[in-house]
């Protein structure tokens, strides 16, 4: 390396500085490759005291590191030089624009990292991917979510040695770049979602390249969507580039999904005690988990003869009074009402959390986030309380509510159709498919999303501003319009009337939604059809069979109802034809037992997601040969392969 050339390029560094920096680079470039990974460079700089990890991380964004993400000697020297500029007061190169009358920033680093506010308002502002854009990271959310990951993944056989991650830096986002931590987090929230054997793992201490990391990111994003996470504008490159606000949002969605998954009357029959006097079980089951949590919270407040109620996870809990009563109800012996006598809100919040600690539930919240009314952290805290200390009397056998069990196929399809409708960004999101479609509004939104311009909203009865339900008569007008639209678009809707949707007829509702989803698939695949028309099931089947042959395999099926599909061999062979080498047949079992068939199906789903396919079904749908859902699996592969 030409020292003179480097000194001209980075005049802020003396010759002595340059020699020292080069030696430090060589100390971490043990194999003399001429480059190191970003993580190594950041750790080296922060260890030397040249900057904090986060300052070095933000500054590196302004150094011309190439697409490989590897830090070469020139880049490393550039990083050190920019950090030196920030300390000597040289004019920083920043991507931040501050309006003349905006709130003053408490501290601004020339690295482009801004700390704004403190205590309850502590936030970090980081540069966006576009010049002039910024994103805000809530420090307490980042810290608590990092603690959660450290806790649930501690001892993991694959990544446990990486933990714990520092809770006071942005290192978490760098650790998430290869998709492995996020995959493990998804499996913690919803076990068995990802077959980790399909993930790309580092070998011989070498980090994954960008392509391998992007495949892992595909699995993460598509799996998160499939378990019901709201994943908007997050792409594989966002993960591998460590974009903080997007990764933090994704982490929250995954944690939230896991925390709320146990708020289910089938798992907790004692939730039946939360029904109000004039409420039916069917109405109660329509509530989203957050509303059930609020109902649970208020049940305990009512049992305590407390005069307040909570309607949110922010201002209604921010003074700590309602939490004091709740914890006292859950365990009067351990959790006293003494915090009510404390007037200072921060002191009271600390006392509340000390009570929670006695229940081994001091998690997610800090005094400052409690007083600030952080809705995410308060929701997580209350969900954790419910999951560990529901405090409801067990239901006796004679009291047990009759929870209607409709046919397994209908339940499976309802789950997939709910996820699909929510992926269209319908508003409000669908919680209970058959109940939420009764007024026709979600159906009509879905028609418009799938076939823009199809719906004349002048003919649609909307809900009043209060959010109250519309009358049965108006709901019938909407659902009749939805059925008429379907017929006009060529759907087979023999015997289906609007009243069937309003009355919650499950079979007929599923039939209508399936045809709408099928049309959505067909529109996406039209470019694949030589005629430009909708593709029939037989054409889709022929395409799948051609892929099997192309991959040198000979499995066959007669239709999408063929029981031979149950062991997933055919689907794995289709994947092999699309992407040779992606199916490791050493991992494929004969499929003689239920466990083997499940393992094969999970393997097929994970490989499809790795390739970038959005797969809604779960392994049981394949094992039980749910024909419609298997068609969606093949159709996703077709759109991927076009």
From Swiss-Prot:
Keywords: Actin-binding, Calcium, Metal-binding, Repeat. It comes from the Eukaryota. One of its GO terms (biological process) is actin filament network formation. Residues 139-259, 287-390, 411-521, 534-642 form the Calponin-homology (CH) domain. Residues 125-394 are annotated as: Actin-binding 1. Signal peptide: none annotated. Ca(2+) 2 binds at residues 66, 68, 70, 75. GO terms for cellular component: actin cortical patch; actin filament; actin filament bundle; cellular bud tip; cytoplasm; mating projection tip; plasma membrane. SMART domains: CH. Residues 16-50, 51-86 form the EF-hand domain. CDD domains: CH_FIMB_rpt1, CH_FIMB_rpt2, CH_FIMB_rpt3, CH_FIMB_rpt4. Residues 395-642 are annotated as: Actin-binding 2. Present with 3510 molecules/cell in log phase SD medium. Binds to actin, and functionally associates with actin structures involved in the development and maintenance of cell polarity. This is Fimbrin.
């Amino acid at each position: 390396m030409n020292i003179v050339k480097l000194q001209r390029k980075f005049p802020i560094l003396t010759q002595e500085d340059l020699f020292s920096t080069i030696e430090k680079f060589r100390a971490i470039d043990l194999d003399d490759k001429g480059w190191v990974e970003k993580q190594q460079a950041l750790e080296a700089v922060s260890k030397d005291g040249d900057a904090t990890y986060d300052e070095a991380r933000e500054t590196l964004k302004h150094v011309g590191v190439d697409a490989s993400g590897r830090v070469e000697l020139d880049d490393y020297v550039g990083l050190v030089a920019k950090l030196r500029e920030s300390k000597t007061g040289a004019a920083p190169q920043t991507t931040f624009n501050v309006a003349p009358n905006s709130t003053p920033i408490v501290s601004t680093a020339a690295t482009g990292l801004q700390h704004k506010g403190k205590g309850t308002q502590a936030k970090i502002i980081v540069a966006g991917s576009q010049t002039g854009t910024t994103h805000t990271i809530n420090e307490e959310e980042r810290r608590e979510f990092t603690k959660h990951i450290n806790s649930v993944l501690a001892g993991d056989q694959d990544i446990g040695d990486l933990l714990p991650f520092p809770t006071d830096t942005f290192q978490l986002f760098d650790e998430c770049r290869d998709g492995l931590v996020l995959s493990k987090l998804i499996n913690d929230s919803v076990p068995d979602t990802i077959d980790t054997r399909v993930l790309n793992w580092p070998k011989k201490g070498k980090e994954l390249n960008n392509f391998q990391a992007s495949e892992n990111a595909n699995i993460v994003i598509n799996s998160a969507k499939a378990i019901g996470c709201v994943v908007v504008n997050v792409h594989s490159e966002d993960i591998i580039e460590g974009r903080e606000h997007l990764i933090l949002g994704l982490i929250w969605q995954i944690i939230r999904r896991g925390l709320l998954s146990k708020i289910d009357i089938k798992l907790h029959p004692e939730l039946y005690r939360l029904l109000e006097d004039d409420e039916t079980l069917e109405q109660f089951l329509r509530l989203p988990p957050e509303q059930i949590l609020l109902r649970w919270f208020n049940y305990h407040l009512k049992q305590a003869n407390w005069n307040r109620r909570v309607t949110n996870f922010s201002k209604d809990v921010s003074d700590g009074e309602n939490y004091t009563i709740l914890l006292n109800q859950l365990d009067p012996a351990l959790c006293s009402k003494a915090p009510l006598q404390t007037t200072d809100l921060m002191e009271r919040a600390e006392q509340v959390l000390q009570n929670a600690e006695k229940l081994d539930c001091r998690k997610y919240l800090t005094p400052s986030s409690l007083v600030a009314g952080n809705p995410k952290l308060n929701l997580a805290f209350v969900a954790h309380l419910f999951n560990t200390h529901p405090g409801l009397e067990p239901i006796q056998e004679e009291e047990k509510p009759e929870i209607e069990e409709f046919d397994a196929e209908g339940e499976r399809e309802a789950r997939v159709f709910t996820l699909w409708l929510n992926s269209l960004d319908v508003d409000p999101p669908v919680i209970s498919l058959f109940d939420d479609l009764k007024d026709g509004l979600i159906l009509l939104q879905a028609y418009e999303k799938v076939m823009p311009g199809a719906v004349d909203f002048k003919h649609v009865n909307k809900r009043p501003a209060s959010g109250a339900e519309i009358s049965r008569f108006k709901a019938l007008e909407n659902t009749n319009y939805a059925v008429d639209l379907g017929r006009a678009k060529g759907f087979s809707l023999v015997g289906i009337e609007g009243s069937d949707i309003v009355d919650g007829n499950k079979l007929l509702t599923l039939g209508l939604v399936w045809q709408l989803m099928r049309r959505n698939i067909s529109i996406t695949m039209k470019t694949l059809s030589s005629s430009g028309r909708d593709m029939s099931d037989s054409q889709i089947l022929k395409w799948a069979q051609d892929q099997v042959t192309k991959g040198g395999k000979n499995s066959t099926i007669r239709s999408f109802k063929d029981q031979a599909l149950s062991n997933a061999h055919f689907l794995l062979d289709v994947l092999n034809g699309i992407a040779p080498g992606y199916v490791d047949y050493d991992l494929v079992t004969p499929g003689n037992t239920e466990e083997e068939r499940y393992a094969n199906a999970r393997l097929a789903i994970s490989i499809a997601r790795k390739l970038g396919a959005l797969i809604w079904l779960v392994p049981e749908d394949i094992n039980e040969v749910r024909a419609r859902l298997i068609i969606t699996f093949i159709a996703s592969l077709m759109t991927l392969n076009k």
